[in-house]
Every structure is written in structure tokens, then in C-alpha cells.
Amino acid sequence: MNVVETLLVDNGSLAPAATLQLRALAKAVGKAVGVEVTPVSLLHSTGVSTPALGDVAAEILEPALELRLMQGKMDFLIVPLFFGPSGALTDYMPKRIAHLRESFPDLSVKLAPVLFQPDDDRLARILADQVRAQLREETRRVAMVDHGSPVRAVAEARDQLAVQLQKLLGPAFTVAAASMERREGVEYDFCEPLLANLLRKPEWSHGDVIVAMQFLLPGRHAGPSGDVAQICDDAEAASGGKLHVYQTGLVAEHPLLVQILADRWRRGLVLGPGAKVL
């Protein structure tokens, strides 16, 4: 029986901290499931200098698979560090694997389920914990923000996650889903509202607001000086001092994420609900 190689795959980032945290996650998931889990990015991360990564170069998916295929390894399980079925998983990744299969016809790849699943509220529990950690005396408004996706199914997953978060926080809170950014065109209106616009609405532009970060790893968008932080700073400035925004930590900082990923690994291994063959 061939040994299945497990890869934990994120989208990739030019921020060293993202790759370092991906590695820590892979190690923790590996410990939880009892196998080695290799951290790999879909793209981008090989642009990070090796010294910034502890002198261990980052890997991206296609070369990482090709290297292992040349070593005779043919069976892989990819655990996606993605909230929903983004184009990276439904379009780009299958095309790259099909390309590799032209040279390695015995290549076998299973894709575990994405993080958000309607029957699992643990992502919402992570966000709820992080919201409570930022509570101020009068804080009852929560803007849950993701990157914003051109894929409707990803936006729908975000909206369902916001409903779960609302249920966990209770009726004393108001939870609104928002996007950091979106593409132009009415066909992408499902991404609305943008966080920048939400924080300028009369009912959101004063007092304390918590921005719940539906982001996994630090990088250009998330973190102390990321795009979301700039949006929040701009909204505070536009309010003339009436608005105070508090950002939560990132999802990967919460220990429950390791349990979720371990369960996605188990489901992917047996091709359970949400898993598929690429």
C-alpha cells in the first residue's frame, strides 16, 4: 500500500510571517493526526527570501508535487487552508494537477473539504471567542470581514458564517458580514457591503465597533499595518473621532483551527462529505 503524502496548502503570501505560521499549523495538525504534514503554498511564497524563513525555502504546489513525484511518491492528500471553494481550488489547482498527470499518469490527489461547512460551527466559535476578547462595555456591533471573492459560493459561505456568529453571540449583538474589497461590476454585488462603506453608515460610524477578522494568516491584508487596518483607521478619521474600531486576532491564532483541520484531513482521507478526487 502506498503512503499518502499530506500537504497543508494555503494561497501563499510574500509576508514571511504567513509561511512561518503555515509551518507551525502543519506541525500541529501532523501531531494531531499522527502523520507528517508538509506546508505548501499555492503561489507567491517562494518570493520570500530564505533567510527570512529560517534558511528553509518555502515551497509552492506544482514544483512541490513534481519533486515528490520524481521520488516515486504518487498519492497525495491536500488539506486546503481556505474558507470556501475559491477559484484556486476549483479551477487553478485542478488544471495544474492535470498538467502534472500528463507526465505522471499514476498521480493520485484527494482534496479534503474546505474549512467552512454548514454542519460545523467551530469557525464561528473561533470568531466568537476573538470578538469576546475585544469587548468593551458598550460594544455590541460586529463587522465580520473577509477578503472578498469573485466566487459567489465563497461569499455565501462568509454570509452563513456570519449567521452562525450572530447565533453564538446572541440577540444583544448586531453582526454584519462585509468584504475588504470586490471586483467592479454588478455581477459581483454579492460581495457587498464593503467594510469601508459599512463603517460610514450612520448606524456604524460612531461608538465602538469590533471588526472580526475572517482571515487566516498575517500578510498584506491582515495584521497591524494591513489593508483592513488602514480601512479601519480611515473610517475612524472620517468620523471625526466618534468611531472606535477594534480588530480581532486572526483565525489561525486560535487552537481550535488545528482540530478543524485534523477533522478535514480525516474526512479527506476517506473521501467523506465535501472531499473529492482531483
Regions found by a protein language model. Name each.
Residues 1-278:
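Extended amphipathic ligand-handling, pore-lining, and cofactor/metal-binding catalytic surfaces
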